[in-house]
């Protein structure tokens, strides 16, 4: 017998399917989102099936390369370089991180629809080798758990680790995201992926993603702006709107594993997470660790982020934490956060 959630969700899936087949061509043409325009100059130095390696470096030295790992989730890596004054990339460069790279995940296609978490690990490993280990990893949101697991899987390839708004122990505190996932049955997830031809389509995931109903307030909160009065503020608003409209499609197996392994089963925090043939023990991550959480973050609440401190093998004196007075998106694109927290991270990375 269907539970109440299934009874609600099956009609939703069916309606979505009918709507897509009836209106998809015209809708896609009319609503095609603006392509990503980077705020900071960069060049692509490696093009893999699942990601691009972008080099933002201002010099030739590779003494302390920093690799920012964007989330492979609903939206693209534009959140790391949204607009002047709203860019972790810009802040890191301006404060001494001159050898700076970004893992920019591609939207999944028919060719990559079977990718798994292992596939993402393998791609990230190739990127680190391309840069030249050891690297400093800066994991943003979903890129955070991947970075922590990578540092535990390949400890000799990492020097320092920064996690920003990263869900590490997903049972440490309730979140809007876990609240969305918990009622969804495995059958519904499989059906969503089947209807996407093996992909979890971003436009479908967006319908389930928790977000405030007041879009204007959400935008201003994410950017940490008052009502815009300057051209720079208006540009930031426009860039946010374009970023918000660009959705990434996810490989079905990868999406399924993230939902089950990270959220429902909390495998990373409980030592039951496997990557590339080995069980991941967070205690193998003995490098200095910086944790940044948002005080009002309902996607990765502070307790989920700061739980990493008790899981890793780093010395207590090598762990630094910071709590920013903001929500989730403002950690990556907020003006105040870019002015205060990211320079602090850059200084810490130079240690």
Positions of the model-derived regions?
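Short, surface-exposed "cap/lid" segments of acyl-processing enzymes
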Residues: 31-32, 38-109
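Amphipathic, low-complexity, repeat-rich surface-exposed segments
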Residues: 1-52, 85, 107, 136, ...
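Gly/Ala-rich beta-loop-alpha elbow adjacent to hydrolase catalytic centers
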Residues: 138-147
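Catalytic histidine neighborhood in serine/cysteine hydrolases
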Residues: 309-329
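Short beta-strand/loop motif that positions the catalytic acidic residue
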Residues: 285, 291-293, 297
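Alpha/beta-hydrolase-fold enzymes
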Residues: 1-17, 132-133, 146-253
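Conserved alpha/beta-hydrolase "acid-adjacent" motif
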Residues: 298-304
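Catalytic histidine-centered segment of alpha/beta-hydrolase-like enzymes
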Residues: 325-340
């Amino acid at each position: 017998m269907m539970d109440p959630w299934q009874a609600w969700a099956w009609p939703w899936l069916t309606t979505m399917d009918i709507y897509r087949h009836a209106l998809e061509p015209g809708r896609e043409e009319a609503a095609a989102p603006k392509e990503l325009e980077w705020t900071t100059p960069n060049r692509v130095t490696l093009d893999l099936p699942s990601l691009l390696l972008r080099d933002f470096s201002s010099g030739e030295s590779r003494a302390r390369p920093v690799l920012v790992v964007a989330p492979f989730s609903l939206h693209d890596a534009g959140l790391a370089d949204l607009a002047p004054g709203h860019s972790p990339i810009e802040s890191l460069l301006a404060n001494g991180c001159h050898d700076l790279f970004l893992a920019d995940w591609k939207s999944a296609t028919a060719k990559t629809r079977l990718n798994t978490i292992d596939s993402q690990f393998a791609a990230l490993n190739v990127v680190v080798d391309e840069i030249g280990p050891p690297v400093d990893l800066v994991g943003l949101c979903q890129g955070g758990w991947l970075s922590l697991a990578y540092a535990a899987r390949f400890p000799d390839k990492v020097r320092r680790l920064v996690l920003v708004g990263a869900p590490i122990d997903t049972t440490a505190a309730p979140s809007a995201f876990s609240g969305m996932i918990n009622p969804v049955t495995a059958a519904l997830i499989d059906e969503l992926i089947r209807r996407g031809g093996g992909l979890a389509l971003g436009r479908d995931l967006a319908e389930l993603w928790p977000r405030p109903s007041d879009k204007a307030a959400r935008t201003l909160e994410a950017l940490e702006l008052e009502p815009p009065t300057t051209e720079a503020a208006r540009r930031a608003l426009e860039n946010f709107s374009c970023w918000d409209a660009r959705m990434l499609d996810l490989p079905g197996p990868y999406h399924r594993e993230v939902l089950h392994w990270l959220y429902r089963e909390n495998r990373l925090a409980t030592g039951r997470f496997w990557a590339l043939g080995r069980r991941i023990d967070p205690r193998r991550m003995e490098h200095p660790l910086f944790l940044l959480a948002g005080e009002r973050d309902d996607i990765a609440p502070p307790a989920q982020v700061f739980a990493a401190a008790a899981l890793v093998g780093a010395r207590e004196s090598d762990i630094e934490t910071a709590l920013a007075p903001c929500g989730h998106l403002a950690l990556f694109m907020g003006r105040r956060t870019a002015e205060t927290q990211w320079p602090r991270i850059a200084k810490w990375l130079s240690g």
